[in-house]
Amino acid sequence: GEAPSDNPPYHMDPEGMMGRASPDQIRSVWLGWLENLASFHKINYEDLELSMIDKRSNESSHLHSDLQYYKSFMEWGMDGEANAFLEEVLLWLSENLPLNPNPKKLCWGDSRIGNVLFENFQVKSLLDWEMATIGDPLCDLAWGLTTDDVSSHGLNVEKLPGSISNEEAIKFWEENTGYSAD
């Protein structure tokens, strides 16, 4: 199979899989990613005896636990130096956590189209599982859409024709999982 390139990002790689693709093929890649993500989020991890990857089993909110992890990681990485912007972001996030998060599910962790192998623009394999955890499945959707935004708008590059909009992706995911992206 073949995966959308990371370096250069697929939105900037005319020789890569996505650069050679038609808009319909690019749409097929995105829909395949979303279909697999939605199916994955329906798996009952307890039936598979995967509860051992639930690093936050004693936390009342897995999203709160994630924020605490990233705050600790930031403090470690900044080596005692303050970063007003990141502190403001963490404060906003902690004050705006969803009141009713989705049920805890198996999460891929690095759920982006660059970690999917395709054959003829159809999903063949999902890769890169070292970030897998138990948490809010919305985090997987957000990660995939955010990494796409960073590799396009974040680099002042237009998304490829056929790319799915964030709004369409969210609607598809909600309809196919029964979970909320609010």
Where are these regions (language model features)?
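An acidic site on a long C-lobe helix of protein kinase domains
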Residues: V29-W33, A82-F85, D110, P137-D140, ...
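Alpha-helix C-capping/helix-to-loop hinge sites
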Residues: F73, G77, L126, D148-S151, ...
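Generic alpha-helical secondary structure signal
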Residues: S61-S65, Y69, A84-E88, F118, ...
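Short, surface-exposed acidic
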Residues: A82-N83, G178-D182
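Active-site activation/catalytic loop segments of kinase-like enzymes and analogous catalytic loops
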Residues: C139-Y179
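ATP-binding pocket architecture of kinase catalytic cores
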Residues: G1-E88, N96-P103, Q122
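Glycine-rich "substrate-gating" loop/helix at the edge of Rossmann-like oxidoreductase active sites
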Residues: D24-I26, W129-T133, L160
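Active-site acidic catalytic loop and adjacent metal/ATP-binding pocket
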Residues: S39-K42, D79, E88-D140, L145
